[in-house]
């Protein structure tokens, strides 16, 4: 469900900017990368389950033990079908900085990397300079052209679709008790998705947005075409 708190000038400008980015033809030297994150609860079985056998489904006890939480950074280049999902101990500025460092390293020939982010407080240059050093952090941030979604507009971030794919195809209803297990599962999912070049087909355009939300394009609205 879309949550649009207020369709003001700032919301429309950022909406149009992100949608204009998605409408651009694929440019290998200017990849469009989307990033989002979500917490993951770690659970362990109290008693071992029963595996499936002919004529019988697998069974699992309802009781489980809480083993803390972890985090998943979903990073995807939708048009190229490149996936960089990573499991981390937490959703901290330091972890974000290291993920960005790895994303930039994956595109050594890019003129710029268009990065779509929501407005979480760690999604900023300061996270990089604080945890990677002033010089290295600034150099990495300069490799990026950041496109922030509007407030209450995170549905515009295709990384949310990536998180949904991970939840259904990777995590499922299984219980993962440790970060090491979560990491091995997400790495395996990355490998499969990258081998298949799994792409996200985004169909919501600026034209559709203007009809859906009933606004006219403002000549001063920022867009990159």
Question: What is each residue range found by the language model?
Answer:
Residues 15-101, 213-216:
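Extended, low-complexity cationic-aromatic segments
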Residues 59-64, 136-158, 174-176:
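RNase H-like polynucleotidyl transferase catalytic core
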Residues 94-114:
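Short, basic/hydrophobic alpha-helical segments
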Residues 83, 159-178, 192-194:
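Active-site proximal helix-loop segment of RNase H-like, two-metal nucleases, encompassing DDE(D)
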Residues 70, 118-119, 146-168, 180:
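RNase H-like two-metal-ion nuclease catalytic core shared by retroviral integrases
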Residues 5-6, 46, 181-225:
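C-terminal domain-tail junction helix/linker
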Residues 111-124:
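Acidic/histidine-rich, metal-coordinating catalytic segments
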Residues 34-36, 75, 81, 100, ...:
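Mobile genetic element proteins and their domesticated derivatives, centered on retroelements
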């Amino acid at each position: 469900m879309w949550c649009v708190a207020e369709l003001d000038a700032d919301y429309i400008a950022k909406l149009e900017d992100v949608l204009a980015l998605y409408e651009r033809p694929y440019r290998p030297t200017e990849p469009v990368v989307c990033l989002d994150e979500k917490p993951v609860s770690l659970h362990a079985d109290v008693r071992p389950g029963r595996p499936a056998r002919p004529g019988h489904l697998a069974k699992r006890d309802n009781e489980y033990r809480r083993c803390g939480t972890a985090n998943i950074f979903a990073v995807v280049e939708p048009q190229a079908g490149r996936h960089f999902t990573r499991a981390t101990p937490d959703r901290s500025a330091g972890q974000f900085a290291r993920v960005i460092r790895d994303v930039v390293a994956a595109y050594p020939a890019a003129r710029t990397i268009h990065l779509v982010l929501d407005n979480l407080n760690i999604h900023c240059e300061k996270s990089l300079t604080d945890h990677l050093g002033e010089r290295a952090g600034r150099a990495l941030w300069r490799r990026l052209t950041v496109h922030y979604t509007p407030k209450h507009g995170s549905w515009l971030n295709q990384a949310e679709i990536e998180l949904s794919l991970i939840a259904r195809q990777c995590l499922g209803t299984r219980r993962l008790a440790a970060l090491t297990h979560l990491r091995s599962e997400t790495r395996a999912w990355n490998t499969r998705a990258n081998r298949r070049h799994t792409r996200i087909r985004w169909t919501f355009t600026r034209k559709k947005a203007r009809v859906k939300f009933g606004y006219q394009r403002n000549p001063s609205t920022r867009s990159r075409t």
